[in-house]
Design a protein with these regions (language model features):
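Active-site phosphate-binding/coordination module
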Residues: 85-86, 97-105
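Ribokinase/PfkB-type carbohydrate-kinase core domain
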Residues: 1-10, 73, 101-163
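Glycine-rich phosphate/adenosyl-contacting loop at the front of the ribokinase-like
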Residues: 1-80, 103, 119-121
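Short beta-strand scaffold segments in enzyme catalytic cores
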Residues: 46, 94-98
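Short Asp/Glu-rich motifs
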Residues: 67-68, 92-94
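A short, structured active-site edge motif that brings together acidic residues
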Residues: 83-92
Length: 163
């Protein structure tokens, strides 16, 4: 029996996804959006928790209302948020998506000064990498430092621990 604290530790992007409520219209004609929490690792942490796994998330949020929105949602879903630091001076990311079936889904990312890209080595040292059965990583964290170094360090720790 594996006695690790978490089944899945997901690391990387989180934010607010704004999906068009007006399906089939050009982006410039959208009248309203619905707000959801998003980011691949964030979605994985929620999905695995809904499947009954012990799920934790390692990401960063800004000290802003969007960060509050993300944390509130994750806590309601039962995802462990102890490893989601607030990053002062940074913003929680956002994306706006249009829906133009069958094959157009225009999107605009707002990632300037994104909090999740401020994850650093100290954040990884505080995270339960060795106490997780799986470390789930995505490529977004590799796009810039300090998150690039932190992501590679997390991968090294996981490999050394047999995660």
């Amino acid at each position: 029996m594996d006695d690790r604290a978490y089944d899945v530790l997901a690391m990387g992007r989180c934010g607010i996804d704004l999906y068009s409520n007006d399906v089939g219209v050009p982006f410039e004609q959208i009248r309203s959006f619905a707000a959801y929490v998003g980011g691949c690792p964030t979605n994985v942490s929620v999905g695995t928790r809904r499947l009954g796994l012990r799920s934790a998330l390692l990401t960063g949020v800004g000290d802003d209302p969007v960060g509050d929105f993300v944390l509130h949602f994750l806590r309601q879903e039962g995802v462990e948020t102890s490893f989601v630091p607030r990053k002062p001076g940074r913003r929680t990311g956002a994306v706006a998506l249009g829906i133009e079936p069958p094959d157009r889904f225009p999107l605009v990312f707002y990632r300037e000064n994104a909090a999740d890209l401020a994850l650093d080595l100290d954040d990884v040292l505080r995270a339960p990498v060795e106490r997780s059965r799986v470390l789930f990583l995505t490529g977004t964290g590799l796009c810039a430092d300090p998150s690039r170094t932190a992501t590679l360090f997390a991968a090294e720790r996981a490999a050394a621990a047999g995660t």
